[in-house]
């Protein structure tokens, strides 16, 4: 029997057989909102609860300390974020509420299992999702980069009258997913790399053919995501039909996520709350709210789940707004592409901020035979400035 199955049975057994006193003692709400994440503590990936974006509670250690009191029955702490997400709605969230309430009510911020955020490494929260699904061109302003106000209004009205269905694509997970503070690496010779800030919806409950009205029942929470993109395309020759989405979206470090996850009960309706921005070296290049979305989050979930079963820990990103690098090129305000040494800050209000430095890969092994992806300039010339 797998660990997750055993934990599910333990939680279910607790609910059925626990004494009335224990049931009454169980926390049904958290005194304060919290976030969840994965952190490097003493060199080990550790599941933690985030309070006020300042304190990190080591869940396993805090759970052990809590269970010293016989009022709290034994529950296995989740070993990783995928396990936490999968068990959250099966009773685990109430133990997390108890941990938070114990820290807050007893002023345990100085306990050994509570750490300052500056003293830990912030890792990608989910290591790793089984799939990342991204919505392409899902904001009206992104669908009309470089448009005049009149053109944008006309194009928006036209699209609203015929929205069709969403366009989704997959990004790699391990290798592509990085946490806040890790470098975004521009692959060797690829000089047309751009940014996109997106809301990342974390699935909490498995489902196939999930209708839009039931979509939020399958959501665990929300984090900040980025869809870093290579706009250099593939070289000529060979099979060249259509866009090469793997080249465009599939490089290492091209899926930043985090810095942590806000469980849905602490965020509210994302279609009302969403406010996302992206800043490069102090200059705001993207800013959008949910009203700019072409297909809303429940519709994206319904569409995605009509194609493939969604599982706990899967990530669905809702797309980006205008203000990308490609849009800056069209407006002739400079290349708009990322440059080594720049610092990116991608923020969603109420969730947090991803911070990344851009670095360039300096070289490649000398024994490559020529089958590798070549530098963009070798077939498209230098990137425009």
What is the role of each PLM region?
Residues 42-43, 139-140, 206-208, 321-325, ...:
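Short, charged beta-turn/beta-strand-edge "cap" motif at the junction between a beta-strand
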Residues 296-308, 316-339:
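A conserved acidic, glycine/proline-rich C-terminal tail/linker
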Residues 123, 129-301, 307, 363-384:
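Glycine-enriched loop-and-adjacent helix/strand subsegments that border the catalytic/binding cleft
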Residues 26-162, 166, 343, 365, ...:
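N-terminal non-catalytic cap/leader segment that marks the start of a structured domain
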Residues 8-20:
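Bacterial N-terminal signal peptides
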Residues 21-25:
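Sec/Tat signal peptide C-region and signal peptidase I cleavage site
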């Amino acid at each position: 029997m797998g660990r997750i199955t055993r934990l599910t049975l333990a939680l279910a057994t607790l609910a059925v057989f626990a004494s009335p006193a224990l049931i009454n003692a169980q926390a049904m709400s958290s005194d304060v909102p919290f976030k969840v994440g994965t952190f490097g503590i003493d060199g080990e990936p550790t599941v933690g609860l985030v309070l006020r974006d300042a304190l990190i509670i080591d869940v396993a250690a805090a759970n052990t300390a809590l269970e010293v009191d016989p009022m709290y029955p034994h529950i296995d702490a989740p070993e990783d974020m995928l396990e936490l997400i999968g068990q959250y709605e099966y009773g685990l969230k109430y133990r997390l509420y108890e941990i938070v309430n114990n820290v807050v009510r007893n002023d345990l911020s100085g306990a050994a299992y509570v750490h300052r955020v500056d003293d830990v490494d912030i890792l990608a929260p989910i290591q790793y999702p089984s799939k990342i699904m991204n919505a392409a061109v899902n904001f009206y302003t992104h669908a009309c980069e470089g448009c005049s106000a009149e053109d944008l209004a006309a194009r928006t009205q036209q699209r609203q009258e015929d929205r069709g269905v969403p366009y989704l694509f997959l990004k790699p997970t391990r290798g592509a997913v990085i946490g806040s503070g890790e470098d975004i690496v521009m692959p060797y010779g690829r000089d047309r790399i751009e940014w996109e800030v997106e809301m990342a919806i974390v699935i909490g409950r498995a489902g196939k053919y999930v209708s839009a009205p039931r979509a939020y029942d399958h959501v665990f929470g929300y984090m900040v995501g980025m869809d870093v993109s290579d706009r250099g395309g593939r070289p000529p020759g060979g099979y060249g039909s259509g866009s090469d989405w793997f080249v465009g979206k599939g490089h290492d470090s091209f899926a930043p996520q985090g810095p942590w996850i806000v469980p849905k009960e602490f965020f509210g309706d994302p279609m009302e709350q969403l406010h996302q921005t992206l800043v490069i070296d102090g200059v705001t290049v993207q800013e959008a709210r949910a009203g700019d979305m072409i297909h809303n989050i429940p519709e994206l979930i319904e569409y995605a789940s009509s194609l493939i079963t969604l599982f706990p820990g899967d990530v669905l990103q809702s797309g980006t707004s205008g203000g990308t690098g490609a849009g800056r090129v069209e407006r002739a305000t400079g290349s708009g592409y990322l440059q080594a040494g720049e610092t990116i800050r991608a923020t969603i209000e109420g969730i947090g901020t991803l911070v990344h430095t851009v670095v360039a890969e300096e070289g490649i092994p000398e024994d490559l035979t020529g089958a590798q992806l070549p530098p963009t300039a070798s077939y498209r010339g230098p990137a425009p400035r």
